[in-house]
Amino acid sequence: QSFAFVGYLPAEKSARTKRIRELESLAYRFSQTQIFIETPYRNNHLFESLIAVCSPQTMLCVATDIACPTQQIISGSIAWWKRNKIELNKRNTVFLLSK
């Protein structure tokens, strides 16, 4: 199983969109899960960008509040996430993108 931790994505929308496309391409080309984080107050912007930019069949795992009583770890396709939104504002979150 291969993965890459890429840290933070760009804050500016067009640069973030470009980076998401690059990461999705890497996930498919190398069967490599792409792991990234965001500052808690920008999580919702990143989440909305992910579901707007990625292909419907791409898988996204959202791991929130890890090791806290409010922990949630949810995986689904982008198509599933479009129907099942989540509130991530001010919550520590790790995002995982894979094929």
Located regions from the model:
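Class I SAM-dependent methyltransferase SAM-binding "motif I" and its flanking Rossmann-like core
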Residues: Q1-L26
